A protein has these predicted regions:
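S-adenosyl-L-methionine
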Residues: 2-54
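C-terminal substrate-binding/active-site "lid" region of AdoMet-derived donor-dependent transferases
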Residues: 8-14, 18, 59-123
């Protein structure tokens, strides 16, 4: 698990103690070149961040996902562009995933639980 916040990483450390398949890494997920030497290929990749380049960051980190592996991408539309309707952003993300030859297994908006959020489940 990668996080840039030391407090969050401390919590992740305790979780990783019980779950041996998680390794806590203090880093910025937008720069995988800074931590790629510490990561092996994974079966499952989860990204849940609130940054403008959410999709681009996910695509950069997909190199760590094994062929046939599953990815989970949470998109926060308002973090990408507050001026566009969320459904347009979700359509744009879907199109870009398809253009990158990413197989979309499912995607759902999270309304009414989380406003302006959508999740994509993909397979590499």
């Amino acid at each position: 698990g990668i996080d840039i916040a030391p407090r969050v990483l401390r919590q992740l450390f305790f979780l990783a103690y019980d779950r041996r398949n998680i390794a806590p890494i203090l880093a910025d997920c937008a720069h995988p070149e800074e931590y790629d030497y510490r990561i092996c290929m994974c079966d499952f990749l989860i990204q849940d961040i609130a940054q403008k380049g959410q999709l681009e960051i996910f695509l950069k980190n997909l190199k760590f996902l094994k062929p046939g592996g599953t990815g989970f991408l949470a998109i926060k539309a308002r973090s990408i562009d507050v001026t566009k309707p969320p459904y347009k952003i979700f359509e744009q993300v879907k199109k870009q995933l398809e253009e990158n030859k990413i197989k979309i297994i499912d995607y759902k908006t999270l309304d009414p639980f989380e406003k302006d959020h959508c999740v994509f489940v993909i397979q590499k």
